[in-house]
Regions:
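DNA major-groove recognition helices of helix-turn-helix
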Residues: 124-143
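Helix-turn-helix DNA-binding module
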Residues: 106-123
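A short pre-motif secondary-structure segment
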Residues: 99-100
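Amphipathic alpha-helical recognition patches that constitute DNA-binding helices
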Residues: 20, 123-124
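N-terminal interaction/assembly modules
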Residues: 1-89, 142-159
Length: 159
């Protein structure tokens, strides 16, 4: 039974998973937020401004991509990352949800977070924030943010 569970749910390297989530939420997520646009109205306006395929009546190679198409694909993918990130934060427990929302959605500093929530600095960094980031890794479903321990003590990432 344990072998089946290990194959379905391999052992997670907690420290490296926490670091991976910090990187995702601190670096990748802000980029995707900027790339996604601010509101659905902005998105609709952006689509309307993009040029459609240029048609001049001459035969063209069908494999050539239009820059507008690539821009739309990047924007839609960024919007999915933003949407799934917010959903994942919302699925965490109340303390983790509050912390992750303040830190990564409202752009609070870590100091502002632990002072607002009311934890000591050491308890925040040693327990509360790592726990919140591990919960986020469990609830984020677009990509696997976990870093796994393999049988040979090597690590592998789902991302």
């Amino acid at each position: 039974m344990d072998n089946q569970m290990d194959s379905l749910f391999p052992q997670v390297d907690r420290d490296r998973t926490v670091e991976n989530c910090k990187h995702f939420l601190g670096s990748l997520f802000p980029r995707m937020l900027r790339a996604s646009g601010l509101t659905s109205a902005n998105y609709d306006a952006m689509i309307a401004r993009l040029k459609s395929l240029a048609m001049d009546g001459m035969p063209k190679s069908p494999t050539k991509l239009n820059n507008a198409d690539a821009t739309i694909v990047r924007r839609v993918y960024a919007q999915q990352i933003v949407k799934r990130t917010v959903e994942a934060i919302d699925r965490c427990d109340n303390v983790s949800k509050e912390l992750l929302s303040m830190r990564y959605l409202d752009n609070y500093t870590d100091t502002m977070c632990y002072m607002t929530i009311g934890y000591s600095r050491s308890h925040y960094f040693d327990h509360i924030k790592p726990s919140a980031l591990l919960q986020f890794a469990d609830t984020y479903l677009l990509d696997d943010l976990h870093i796994y321990k393999s049988d040979l003590n090597q690590t592998q990432s789902g991302l």
